[in-house]
Design a protein with these regions (language model features):
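Generic serine detector
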Residues: 5, 36, 46-47, 63, ...
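Outer-membrane beta-barrel transmembrane strand signature
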Residues: 1-13, 20, 107-185, 232-283
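Extracellular/periplasmic, surface-exposed regions of secreted and cell-surface proteins
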Residues: 1-116, 256, 260-328
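Conserved small-residue
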Residues: 50, 69-162, 193, 200-236, ...
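Extracytoplasmic gating/loop element in the C-terminal half of outer-membrane beta-barrel translocons
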Residues: 190-292, 297-298, 310, 314
Length: 328
């Protein structure tokens, strides 16, 4: 593997070091990476290893820290804050001659891939069958069968990407008369994740979304059409909730990827730490020169998330780079 990298940075301080800004831009190209390419079964081997590919990482890292309030008294009230922002774009420039899609991880109907010309971690899976004629007034609508249930495409297509658009961490630290309190709020904005847990809940009828207005009445699948006389007409065939979710869950063991791929955006109170530092006078008759006692609580509060009651960080394939799949 060969790596070429470029980096530029800036470090500035203001107001007698009470305010600081660190800025870094980077760009790296990793080539000749070790890839496993599948072979014809008649070759006697399942795959071969080759050195190929060109993966480009480009991103920004910005850190802003400040002493919001400083007391002239050592034991007085102090408040310090830090904001750390980062974004990264991991683009697949090239893979291998004749190869445009490289499998990172396949889990039943879900496939995490590196697609040439796209970004690392694209999520591929089956989707609803839709009207593809752009000249049709029904373009983009879901096609259903005569039974009113959606038809499923046979081929996989892109339904999302596992990488976040950007991330931000906000840390605040307070101290007063030996006591210290700090907390961290994390922002993970963008990216997608497929939830097998949500699929199981919906398909079994245990999710709140399977009930409309407190009842499971028959309904017409919205924004759908049915084939008729060489064209399409609006669908008006009612279906039961059970039949609908059974159809959605009929794609592999984990259900239809298009339906159960969610925006992985989440904002959380990552941790809180409360501590107390004993002064030297209190430690005179002890063998300690300095003593601090603290208690920490992690994953305190999920402020915002899009998955139905599921932590988007509870990924399934933790031993690989395929983080776009959850099966809690």
């Amino acid at each position: 593997e060969l790596i070429k990298s470029w980096e530029a940075g800036l470090d500035v301080r203001f107001l007698q070091n009470r305010l600081g800004l660190d800025f870094a831009w980077y760009k790296t190209n990793a080539t000749r990476q070790l890839l496993n390419l599948p072979l014809d079964p008649f070759a006697g081997y399942s795959s071969r290893k080759v050195n190929a590919g060109n993966i480009q990482n480009e991103g920004l890292e910005i850190s802003l820290n400040g002493a919001i309030f400083q007391s002239p008294d050592v034991q007085g009230f102090n408040w310090n804050a830090t904001a750390q922002f980062s974004l990264n774009r991991n683009k697949i420039i090239d893979l291998y001659p004749g190869v445009t899609l490289y499998d990172i991880k396949t889990l039943d109907a879900i496939q995490i891939v590196a697609a040439q010309g796209s970004y690392y971690g694209d999520i591929y899976g089956q989707t609803f069958l839709r009207v593809t004629d752009k000249d049709s007034p029904h373009y983009g609508k879901v096609i259903v069968g005569d039974d009113g249930l959606p038809l499923i495409s046979a081929e996989k297509s892109k339904v999302g990407n596992q990488s976040p658009d950007w991330m931000l961490g906000l840390t605040n630290s307070f101290s007063y008369k030996g006591f210290n309190l700090s907390f961290l709020v994390d922002f993970r904005i963008g990216g997608d994740i497929y939830s097998a847990t949500a699929s199981n809940l919906f398909v079994r009828g245990n999710a709140a979304g399977t009930v409309v207005n407190g009842e499971r009445q028959d309904f017409v699948v919205p924004n759908t059409v049915v084939r008729k006389d060489g064209g399409y007409v609006e669908n008006n065939v009612p279906v039961t909730h059970q039949n609908y979710w059974e159809r959605i869950g009929s794609t592999g063991n984990y259900g239809l990827p298009e339906v159960f791929t969610y925006d992985a955006t989440n904002i959380r109170l990552r941790n809180i730490t409360l501590g107390y530092t004993f002064n030297r006078a209190m430690l005179k008759k002890t063998p300690f020169q300095r003593l601090n006692l603290s208690a920490t609580c992690n994953n305190v509060w999920m402020i915002h998330y899009n998955l139905p009651g599921i932590d988007p960080e509870s990924v399934s394939a933790t031993n690989t780079n395929a983080t776009g799949f959850e099966n809690g």
